[in-house]
């Protein structure tokens, strides 16, 4: 009996995980315009090639490769400023040594 309950539980979890239920009712999905330019150019063409599961990930707000690359390029600024600040003390040390050589 316990084995049957475990199998039913695993089956229910698998069906839930692999189901492609939409957040919108089916009637709203049919009324929505479709095609490559339907979302005003917001949905990239690579998403259409990945199938319906990717559409649901898009609805959930998960990012694809173009957005991830853009996010990585945004994150370059802060640590570059920290590195420049870290090299400032090295420059100061070099200038101090040069000043010491000029004064006997």
Curated annotation (Swiss-Prot):
In the record, Phosphoserine modifications are located at 96
- Residues with the Pyrrolidone carboxylic acid modification: 59, 76
At which residues is Phenylalanine amide found?
92
Q: Which PANTHER family match?
A: GASTRIN
Protein role: Gastrin stimulates the stomach mucosa to produce and secrete hydrochloric acid and the pancreas to secrete its digestive enzymes. It also stimulates smooth muscle contraction and increases blood circulation and water secretion in the stomach and intestine.
- On the tree of life, the source organism's domain of life is Eukaryota
| Annotated spans, Disordered | 22-49
User: Which UniProt key words apply to this protein?
Assistant: Amidation, Cleavage on pair of basic residues, Hormone, Phosphoprotein, Pyrrolidone carboxylic acid, Secreted, Signal, Sulfation
Tell me which positions the record assigns to the signal sequence. 1-21
Q: Name one GO cellular component term.
A: extracellular space
Which residues are reported to carry the modification Sulfotyrosine?
Answer: 87
Gene Ontology molecular function terms on file: hormone activity
Propeptide cleavage-removed residue intervals: 22-58, 96-104
Q: Which PROSITE patterns match?
A: GASTRIN
Q: What is this protein called?
A: Gastrin
* Native organism: Felis catus (Cat)
The protein's predominant localisation is secreted
């Amino acid at each position: 009996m316990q084995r049957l309950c475990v199998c039913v539980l695993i089956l229910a979890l698998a069906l839930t995980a692999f189901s492609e239920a939409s957040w919108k009712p089916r009637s709203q999905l049919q009324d929505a315009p479709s095609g490559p330019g339907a979302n005003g150019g917001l949905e990239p063409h690579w998403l259409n090639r990945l199938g319906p599961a990717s559409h649901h990930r898009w609805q959930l707000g998960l990012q694809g490769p173009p957005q991830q690359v853009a996010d990585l390029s945004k994150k370059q600024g802060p640590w570059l400023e920290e590195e420049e600040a870290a090299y400032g003390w090295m420059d100061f040390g070099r200038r101090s040594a040069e000043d010491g050589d000029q004064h006997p």
